[in-house]
Swiss-Prot record:
Domain of life: Bacteria
GO molecular function: serine-type endopeptidase activity
Name assigned to this protein: Probable periplasmic serine endoprotease DegP-like
Function: Might be efficient in the degradation of transiently denatured and unfolded proteins which accumulate in the periplasm following stress conditions.
Record-listed substrate binding positions: G245, N246, S247, L302, G303, V304, T305, L306
Length: 497
C-alpha cells in the first residue's frame, strides 16, 4: 500500500515533466475518451517512472561529479585562530554552523567582558570546489581558502595539484583558485532566477572528507537574507543534505547546471538537519567573472544607510504594505546626495522592480557597474517620487584593509545585530566581527563583539567613515575607542609599516 501511495504521489507531481518521458493516458481516436490502463499496467508504469527518475539523478551525478574537487587549505605557518568561548551573554545557541569556520563561529560566540580568546593552532581547512573552465579555474568559498599557506586540490580521478589564489570576495564568501592543468571537465551555470520552490536540487561535495558525495533534495525557499553570514545575502535554501566539508561545492538542478554555491547550514549540532544555504548562481557568476578577469570585484555605490521596513514603519510612512527600505542616513558627496535623496525617504522600487527587502536592494545596487543609471521610486511624505541616480564605484576600502592587516574584521552595525547584542536600534558604532590571534589587535585586547566608537579621536558610525579616517593614517599607529556593554576603553593598534 505504501509503495502504491508513493508511486501515485510521484506520478502526479514530478513525473509529469516531458524530460522524464512521462506520457498521459492514451485516447481512443474514435471516441476521444481516455482509456484507463489495467491496475497491473499502472503499477508497471509507476515502477518505470521510479526507475526513470533514478536514472535522471544518476546521469546528473555521473556527468557533474568529475568537475567537483576536494580542497585542503594548510594555513600559513604560525597562523592561529581564536577559539570560540562559551556563550555568556544570554544568547540562544547560534544555529548557523559555518562549516567549522572560526570566523563565523566567533561572530555569535562572543566573549564576556572578563574573557579573552584562547589562541589555538589552526588545523587544515577542508572543503569543496568545482571547476568552471577546462584550463583549471576553480570556484569555492572564501572561508575555505582564507589565510591560505598552501592549497591542495584533488580531482575526482585522484590527481593532486597545488593551487594559487586568483581572487577573493569575502563580502559574498566566494573565491577563485587555479590549478595548472588542461582539458579538465567543468561545470556550467544555470539561471537561479528561474528556480521554483519545490524544484529538485542536487548537492555534490566532500562532507567530513567523504569525497564525491551526492545528495538530493528540493529548493525550500529563495531570497533568504538577514542571516548575517556575509555582507551580500540572497541565499537559496535547500534540504539536500549539506554537512561540514560541502562548503564551496555546487548545488545543481536536474539538468546538471550549477544553480548555487553551497555555503552554510543551520544546525544545533554541527551536522545536517535539513536547512542549507547556497549563493545563487546569478550573483555568484557576476562575482566569479570579475575575480577571474580582474582579481577583485567592482561594486556599485549609492551612498545611503538603510533600515528594513516592518509593519509599524509601513503604517507610519503610509505604505500600502510591508516593503521597501528606509533611508536613515545619506553619505556626504555620494550619488544619493547629489540626486536629492533624503533621510526618511522610503525606496520602494528600482527601475520598475519592487523592493522586496533591504538586502534585495543592496544586492541589486552592488551588482550594478559604476556609471549605471537607476531610477528609484521613493515615498516621501506620503507621495511617490521617481529620482534618477547614477551609481558610482564603491569607495576603496583602504581603511578596512589597513584594519585587517592589524587583525580586525569589521562591519556596519545593523538593527539585527543590535537586537542580538541587546542594544538600542539607533546605537552608533562599527561591529568587530573577528580578531586574528597573535595580531596587533589581539595583543591590544580587541575582541569580537566589541563596538568601535572612534578612530584616532574621530567618531565613526559606518565603515565608510572609518575608511576616510584611516586613509589619512597610513603607516601610523591607530587609536581606537571601543566599547563592550557599558565598558569603554582606548586601545592602540601598532602598525607594521
Amino acid at each position: 500500500m505504501m509503495k502504491r501511495l508513493l508511486c501515485v504521489l510521484l506520478s502526479t507531481s514530478v513525473f509529469s515533466s516531458p524530460m522524464l518521458g512521462y506520457s498521459a493516458p492514451k485516447k481512443d481516436s474514435s471516441t476521444g475518451i481516455c482509456l484507463a490502463a489495467s491496475q497491473s499496467d499502472r503499477e508497471l508504469s509507476q515502477e518505470d517512472l521510479l526507475k526513470e527518475v533514478s536514472r535522471g539523478f544518476s546521469k546528473v551525478a555521473a556527468q557533474a561529479t568529475p568537475g567537483v574537487v576536494y580542497i585542503e587549505n594548510f594555513p600559513k605557518t604560525g597562523s592561529q585562530a581564536i577559539a570560540s568561548p562559551g556563550n555568556k551573554r544570554g544568547f540562544q545557541e547560534n544555529p548557523f554552523d559555518y562549516f567549522n569556520d572560526e570566523f563565523f563561529n566567533r561572530f555569535f560566540g562572543l566573549p564576556s567582558h572578563r574573557e579573552q580568546p584562547r589562541p589555538q593552532q589552526r588545523d587544515a581547512v577542508r572543503g569543496t570546489g568545482f571547476i568552471v573552465s577546462e584550463d583549471g579555474y576553480v570556484v569555492t568559498n572564501h572561508h575555505v581558502v582564507e589565510d591560505a599557506g598552501k592549497i591542495h586540490v584533488t580531482l575526482h580521478d585522484g590527481q593532486k595539484y597545488t593551487a594559487k589564489i586568483i581572487g577573493l570576495d569575502p563580502k559574498t564568501d566566494l573565491a577563485v583558485i587555479k590549478i595548472q592543468a588542461k582539458n579538465l571537465p567543468f561545470l556550467t551555470f544555470g539561471n537561479s532566477d528561474q528556480l521554483q520552490i519545490g524544484d529538485w536540487s542536487i548537492a555534490i561535495g566532500n562532507p567530513f572528507g567523504l569525497q564525491a558525495t551526492v545528495t538530493v533534495g528540493v529548493i525550500s525557499a529563495k531570497g533568504r537574507n538577514q542571516l548575517h553570514i556575509v555582507d551580500f545575502e540572497d541565499f537559496i535554501q535547500t534540504d539536500a543534505a549539506i554537512n561540514p566539508g560541502n562548503s564551496g561545492g555546487p548545488l545543481l538542478n536536474i539538468d546538471g547546471q550549477v544553480i548555487g554555491v553551497n555555503t552554510a547550514i543551520v544546525s544545533g549540532s554541527g551536522g545536517y538537519i535539513g536547512i542549507g544555504f547556497a549563493i545563487p548562481s546569478l550573483m555568484a557568476k557576476r562575482v566569479i567573472d570579475q575575480l577571474i578577469s580582474d582579481g577583485q570585484v567592482t561594486r556599485g555605490f549609492l551612498g545611503v544607510t538603510l533600515q528594513p521596513i516592518d509593519s509599524e514603519l509601513a503604517a507610519c510612512y503610509k505604505l500600502e504594505k510591508v516593503y521597501g527600505a528606509l533611508i536613515t542616513d545619506v553619505v556626504k558627496g555620494s550619488p544619493a546626495e547629489k540626486a536629492g535623496l533624503r533621510q526618511e525617504d522610503v525606496i520602494v522600487a528600482y527601475n520598475g522592480k519592487e523592493v522586496e527587502s533591504l538586502s534585495a536592494l543592496r544586492n541589486a545596487i552592488s551588482l550594478m557597474m559604476p556609471g549605471t543609471r537607476v531610477v528609484l521610486k521613493v515615498v516621501r511624505e506620503g507621495k511617490f517620487i521617481e529620482i534618477p541616480v547614477t551609481v558610482t564605484q564603491i569607495p576603496a576600502e583602504d581603511g578596512v584593509s589597513a584594519l585587517q592587516k592589524m587583525g580586525v574584521r569589521v562591519q556596519n552595525l545593523t538593527p539585527e545585530i543590535c537586537k542580538k547584542l541587546g542594544l538600542a536600534s539607533d546605537t552608533r558604532g562599527i561591529f568587530v566581527v573577528s580578531v586574528e590571534a597573535g595580531s596587533p589587535a589581539a595583543s591590544a585586547g580587541v575582541v569580537p563583539g566589541q563596538l568601535i566608537l572612534a578612530v584616532n579621536r574621530q567618531r565613526v558610525s559606518s565603515v565608510e567613515e572609518l575608511n576616510q579616517v584611516l586613509k589619512n593614517a597610513k603607516g601610523e599607529n591607530v587609536l581606537l575607542m571601543v566599547s563592550q556593554g557599558e565598558v569603554i576603553r582606548f586601545v592602540v593598534l601598532k602598525s607594521d609599516e
